[in-house]
Amino acid sequence: MKKQIVFLMTDTTRKDMVGCYGNPKMKTPNLDRLAEEGIRYENAYTCQPVCGPARSAIFTGTFPHSNGMVTNSIAMGANVKTVGQRLSDNGIECGYIGKWHLDGSDYFGTGECPEGWNPDYWYDMKCYLEELSEDRKSTRLNSSHRSQSRMPSSA
């Protein structure tokens, strides 16, 4: 059987927001079970407190000033390889689900699978947005720190 890697990364989650780190009020049984069966880090460091650059470092192993993604909405350099590309170069299929944020577009991404990842298992936020109903799409697009979100009429 081929070895498999499953890498889960939550977005904007402090340590005290997950039960496995000791907060009895946070009910996160699935994350707690994964932490029990996998690797749970006690200390963390981010090279950049902004989503895109932080993700670029995690997925490339290089600092943002080296890979070109020094802020959100700026793509990494074309010659920069992600872990998915490196793994696929070695015969390991790679899929991705979630907020990509490495293509230089807006929050939702382009919906296009980058080189080295399996397009059958590629689902970024743009793909998610395209599946939403118009009410939910409007709510998601309008939710920001600057504007008020409206609840869908079906809620």
Would you name each region that the model predicts?
Residues 1-140:
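Formylglycine-dependent sulfatase
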Residues 135-137, 141-155:
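Single conserved hydrophobic/aromatic residue that forms the stacking wall/gate
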